Amino acid sequence: MTQTLSQLENSGAFIERHIGPDAAQQQEMLNAVGAQSLNALTGQIVPKDIQLATPPQVGAPATEYAALAELKAIASRNKRFTSYIGIGYTAVQLPPVILRNMLENPGWYTAYTPYQPEVSQGRLEALLNFQQVTLDLTGLDMASASLLDEATAAAEAMAMAKRVSKLKNANRFFVASDVHPQTLDVVRTRAETFGFEVIVDDAQKVLDHQDVFGVLLQQVGTTGEIHDYTALISELKSRKIVVSVAADIMALVLLTAPGKQGADIVFGSAQRFGVPMGYGGPHAAFFAAKDEYKRSMPGRIIGVSKDAAGNTALRMAMQTREQHIRREKANSNICTSQVLLANIASLYAVYHGPVGLKRIANRIHRLTDILAAGLQQKGQKLRHAHYFDTLCVEVADKAGVLARAEAAEINLRSDILNAVGITLDETTTRENVMQLFSVLLGDNHGLDIDTLDKDVAHDSRSIQPAMLRDDEILTHPVFNRYHSETEMMRYMHSLERKDLALNQAMIPLGSCTMKLNAAAEMIPITWPEFAELHPFCPPEQAEGYQQMIAQLADWLVKLTGYDAVCMQPNSGAQGEYAGLLAIRHYHESRNEGHRDICLIPASAHGTNPASAHMAGMQVVVVACDKNGNIDLTDLRAKAEQAGDNLSCIMVTYPSTHGVYEETIREVCEIVHQFGGQVYLDGANMNAQVGITSPGFIGADVSHLNLHKTFCIPHGGGGPGMGPIGVKAHLAPFVPGHSVVQIEGMLTRQGAVSAAPFGSASILPISWMYIRMMGAEGLKKASQVAILNANYIASRLQDAFPVLYTGRDGRVAHECILDIRPLKEETGISELDIAKRLIDYGFHAPTMSFPVAGTLMVEPTESESKVELDRFIDAMLAIRAEIDQVKAGVWPLEDNPLVNAPHIQNELVAEWAHPYSREVAVFPAGVADKYWPTVKRLDDVYGDRNLFCSCVPISEYQ
């Protein structure tokens, strides 16, 4: 044997697991596109002046097992204290049936946002359940399918309040002084760019303030007090002030719904419904409003509609409110939400049902009553008489109490003057309460749980009678049926089977990077060392997190060519917002706050103009030339016209048209010449890593979609992560945090997310990916992504012309197929092709973006040549079907394309089509069949007959 031990150890084995085509397949594809090697191909495609001379120094690759062992050692540095800190985060019990069948199931976590409803009915149903939970608990009429976190939801509530306010000249937003501090932090950040004045005061003093358009109250205050705001809300409504209420989802099981008290908007975190704290996230926020405000709501809304056969079907409703359509006029810049986490919360509610949830909530409250009674019996004073799960305990020897707590590995809330906060949760036990007595009273307290239980069971006054819920919740059958594990497992599987995810087929969505989310990358997110930490625990308890985050940030700095990375943004859109705020504050620091014009190419993703608007900027569109590139003449003219008011340009690279623009450095130079900054959207970073970098190109700031390039799964529409990389001059202006000092970040800026490191518990996924790939693997991944896209483009060019190409007719990592000539010639549209692909077992490419009448295809590096050929064969077969329509063999109004997709029921129904059942459902020899459960949806019906709560169970059967 001639191999060395190093070769046998094969530290780069994961590279071959992650990259779909093996060496032989890569060579076949290189031959097909006319290139000798990967280096030769990328050398032809990527402009010479931006190619890196040396690879980023991120280390050698590691095996899956070595990387897991290394990360486990880092995770073990985290200390798992029992946290009673509260402030919007509590420990949970995630039911194992949900853990195994959803969180650890690629059928759920590798799906995409349900823009294609025919292949998304399962998660759409779970999201509809989430909306129903929200409606029942808040007492309002309309709910969204999740926002990024509670603090972001508060900022969205403020923006929405201004949109719907009848007090058009009012410009002040009132925040009650006992909202969570991180909520206030994010609200203040958003208010600054909108020009709102934020007033913080005791809620009962709100009427002392003039010119208020909206009010934010918190039903259970940050230190635990339950407020009955019925009379105050009534008075505010009489003055036409929009009222938003932050609520605790578990407390709402027992407390009066704020909507019943007159609130216009109610929101909060769904974290308590089964989602681990995870050092701050990811967590879904719930958001509800009155029906009259539905068209002003932010985020996704799931609606009930009909399919082509008249059957009930679900879809994302009222998308005309959203950034991908309305751009800078959108209600929000939200693109990613928190679908996977919302679905965990919704299934937590399904599994426990109303009876189970009431038992959990009552048990938490009972233990809190017992703790309160014992403390009061021993002379301790409580700040609040009315509470659900949180006590604010006045203590004479605060230092001594905190020292005993630390010795017992307990975290109490310590930032309250002369008091400590204690928040109990569903994991709290009798033993925990006895331990708390010892911490607060000493070991010789002499208290007995059972005796205290009898006392409070007969005389609990901690919830005001007027605040006790008197209506039933979760009466829909879906919440009252699946309570055995067998039934729950089957229900979840029935939902999963309705959807198309990466565990079944390639998802060739352009601008989405639906690559492999490897099992080894996913394993660490469920480790208790990562999952169970409170985001506001003392930093010495999170040394493992700090080390992991610091390493990941260092790698990202090297891969991007920037000087610093901020991990706080919870999504790409939020990263855009954070990056633009950094630019805004940088200009202000130089007394150039008047710079507010943001140049955006016409080809840009809708989040770009929406984020610019949210950051207080004016959007000026820059034209693209006939080749899809930024028109330099127009750019120079627009930059010169903006002059001293030019803030920045937002540009995507490679371009959204799927091309490496030759003039990208000149674009940066023009903007810098006029005093602007360059924001390079990181959406297409998968075609840069190891080959070039934003910093090397000349950009000043970028967000990175960790859920694209760096392997965090899309989760069916979230979670995402959008950390920003910045040059040194912008580093002081990245988001900070009011509760936790972010080590290494000398920033005084406000927060954009509730937690200091955003969705910290999914960062191990990207850490694992980079560690296992190493520098050589990361570059190769980019190169193979480019090869795969060019292979598809070259094979489909004759059937579906590629709209834009760069040098030598090449594309970057994605290509746009132009369907417009075919549509004009035959009447068959890009929509028909997209739906017909479902019959062939594929998710559609991106439709009509960035150019109407096109399909944008991004195969990623993870798809093998076998899968690419299967997709290509399907597209060529569809082209042959279009030719049949063109030839008159099938009429335009009745053919396999316009009737697609086809469902199983049609096999046994009467058949009157001019093509066979076999052609309909087993086209071109398709054997491994994915079956959609609904036919093409009627979008017009869905928006005209908006219905966003659960339908009768019979409709699903």
Swiss-Prot record:
Q: How does it assemble?
A: The glycine cleavage system is composed of four proteins: P, T, L and H.
This protein's cofactor list reads:
pyridoxal 5'-phosphate
Fetch the InterPro entries from UniProt.
GcvP, GDC-P_C, GDC-P_N, GDC_P, PyrdxlP-dep_Trfase, PyrdxlP-dep_Trfase_major, PyrdxlP-dep_Trfase_small
Claim: Lyase is one of the keywords in the record: no
As recorded in UniProt, its EC number(s) are: 1.4.4.2
Q: Which residues carry this modification: N6-(pyridoxal phosphate)lysine?
A: 708
Q: What does this protein do?
A: The glycine cleavage system catalyzes the degradation of glycine. The P protein binds the alpha-amino group of glycine through its pyridoxal phosphate cofactor; CO(2) is released and the remaining methylamine moiety is then transferred to the lipoamide cofactor of the H protein.
Q: Which GO terms describe its biological process?
A: glycine decarboxylation via glycine cleavage system
| Keywords for this protein | Oxidoreductase, Pyridoxal phosphate
GO CC terms: cytosol; glycine cleavage complex
Q: Which HAMAP family match?
A: GcvP (MF_00711)
Q: What is the name of this protein?
A: Glycine dehydrogenase (decarboxylating)
**CDD domains from the xrefs?**
GDC-P
What is the reaction catalyzed? N(6)-[(R)-lipoyl]-L-lysyl-[glycine-cleavage complex H protein] + glycine + H(+) = N(6)-[(R)-S(8)-aminomethyldihydrolipoyl]-L-lysyl-[glycine-cleavage complex H protein] + CO2
Query: What is a single molecular function from GO for this protein?
Result: pyridoxal phosphate binding
By sequence similarity, the record places it as follows:
Belongs to the GcvP family.
